[in-house]
Amino acid sequence: NNISRMVIRQAAGAISGMIAANVKEANESAGSIAISIFGNTTKCVDKCSEILKVDGYDVSTFHSVGIGGKMMESLILDGYFDAVLDITTTELADNLCDGICSSGPDRLTAASQMGIPQVVVPGCLDMVNYGHLDTVPDRFKDRLLYSWSPDVTLMRTNEVENEILGKELAEKLNKSSGPVKVLLPLRGISIVSSEGGEFYRPEIDQILFDSIKKNVNNSIEVIEVDANINDEAFAELAVATLMKMKSI
């Protein structure tokens, strides 16, 4: 992608003995798109990336594990991207509940500061990430916990946390100087919150959705989608929505 090509070119310049390699990236694509990804949203992001690449876009994915979110925000501020598909905002939940994937208070702020188009999804806000079961804070020991792997324990966010998270997401987007749309996948915001999944609690998801809707500015369209976040139809709509915003 554009970022890796620039790094390689700068490295080549240094190796050839240049004091300062000021490499300008050629306009080799239709544009550069940043996308946030997680294990529980991989299918969605893979489909989004596939569609965008076919259309000539340069796509960079960032794993929402803390450092990934920080890197994405930093590169957005540096002007590397033309738009953002923020599919996986789970780092907000980790920041709220002291999870291991927190990226700090500045997550979900850079695109708004830069004024670039962004489509935002509350992907994986149903969970907080911890390490081994023994690392879960004592105050959360009686919560709904799920071992995603031997070294990863997920905690289901509750009603109070979802009310807070919805408001936080909305208030951050309200500060945007550019176009914003929010997509709500009504059939689950992760794999494990799909029907029959370990975190399937549609009534809690609804609290999150309602909190977002009542706190966003009137200028931000909230689109409810009768699909799970990992359904192909949801990914197609997410990309189509972003492309329409870029053409405004």
Regions found by a protein language model. Give the residues of each.
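Metallocofactor- and cofactor-centric catalytic cores in central/energy metabolism, strongly enriched
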Residues: 1-113, 118-120, 130, 143, ...
